[in-house]
Amino acid sequence: MKRFLALVALVATLVGCAKPVEPAQKFDKFNSVVYEMNIRQATEEGTFAAAEKYLPELKAMGVDIVWLMPVSPIGVDGRKGTLGSYYSIIDYKAINPEFGTMDDFKHFLATAHDLGLKVILDWVANHTSRDANWWKEGKTDWYVMDEKTGLPIVEYDWTDIAKLNYKNQDMRAAMLDALKFWIELGVDGYRCDVAMNVPADFWKGAWEEVRKINPEVYLLAEGEEPWLHECGFEATYAWELHHIFNAMAKGGSETKNVAGDGTIKTDAKTVKDLKEYMARDDEKYPAPAMRLMFTSNHDENSWAGTEFERMGDAHKAFAALTFVMPKSQPLIYTGQEIALNRRLQFFEKDSVKELVDLEYGKEYRDFYRALCSFRHANKALAAGENVAPAQFVEGVADSVLAFTRTKEDNTVLCLFNFSVEPVKVTLNEAEAGDYMCACGEAKSFKPGDVVELPAWGFMLLSK
């Protein structure tokens, strides 16, 4: 019986081996990789001009879409910290002077487009700052008011924002006008903050109008509600999946049942839970829906912790999985490509100074470059109308997630060990064949061959 040893993590086998795939002439949103850029923290200067210099590195990494966190001026009333929250906006049509000028933004956008990158803006349609221009202009009926205080209501603990009133048609018209403004400027789409808190009929009508300007506009919703896809969004957040990742990595924590019946409750998750999630997700989100999958983003990094805190030694395996699951649209957050193990401050300046040193964090830069390359090289991994389903490998250990995905003449074989112990995977006739590993090495398997996966190890192959 022939045996194959998979190295501890994909990066151990593919660093320096995989070559970036040349981008197609036409943008393929269904096989794209998103990079969330935190302009404030991405460089020491925290400006568009400084961040623009990093765009060629993102292109070389294999990024397709650059999502910019909000770029508009930030409110002062109720401001959190020194610099405030990006999501507390004064003027939807203006640029935060902290980042530069409108001309600086246009230059950033032009450079991105010259490189073949798409740029989407983080759009906050649910609320403005408490001192926004609309409020100062006396448009109080544009807001949801608190009868007791006579001021706009506060949602959650967001004491620096004012909830907008979507029953007001004038406010809706102004919001649509602002959305169209940036598309006419050349922006390629939006990531919409707390999209599920904005009425469905507004989104549907707005996107119909926006697509008259640019039919190829790309739309990502922060929310998991399936109805968001019916309103025109291509992609939604896979939050539930992310929390399953965290729980699988930590192994869960046990607590006694509060009813006192002696049973134990646990938040631990296993591969079984992951497979059940995949089945639910497939049913809830019919193709061509895409699901944004991630191990970090601005919320998780600042408030829940880095992927190293939450996932420990499992972080690379889960990152790799986001690139190969059905309907996935993988996300990389600022600093992940250099293994940044620090919670970035949200309301203060906290630069990722090492990012511009292209020799720094080379192991992780190459790791993500190889994942992007593998994604782009295999049409079986693309989302879209004819998304290839996962066919699970039979007879594997409970800790193993093993599946193939096939589209036309292209098949990928993905093997993951989600445990702290090494495991052996015996391949069946269905998985036999000649493959190319994501590391660039050729591998041939016969029925009965065994692949050895170390703790949290994985292997990605294609033919």
Locate each region found by the language model.
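Carbohydrate-binding surface patches
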Residues: Q391-N428
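C-terminal motif of bacterial Sec signal peptides marking the signal peptidase cleavage site
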Residues: V15-G16
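Active-site clefts of carbohydrate-active enzymes
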Residues: P286-E309
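Beta-strand-rich binding/interaction modules
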Residues: P422-E441
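Substrate-binding/active-site clefts of carbohydrate-active enzymes
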Residues: P20-D64, P70-L185, G205-N214, Y218, ...
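Active-site-proximal helices and loops of the catalytic beta/alpha 8
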Residues: D193-A287, R291, L321-V324, A339-F374, ...
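C-terminal beta-strand-rich structural cap/linker in extracellular carbohydrate-active enzymes
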Residues: K446-K463
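Short, solvent-exposed turn/loop segments enriched in Gly/Ser/Thr/Pro and often Arg
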Residues: W67-G81, D122-D131, D193-P199, E222-P226, ...
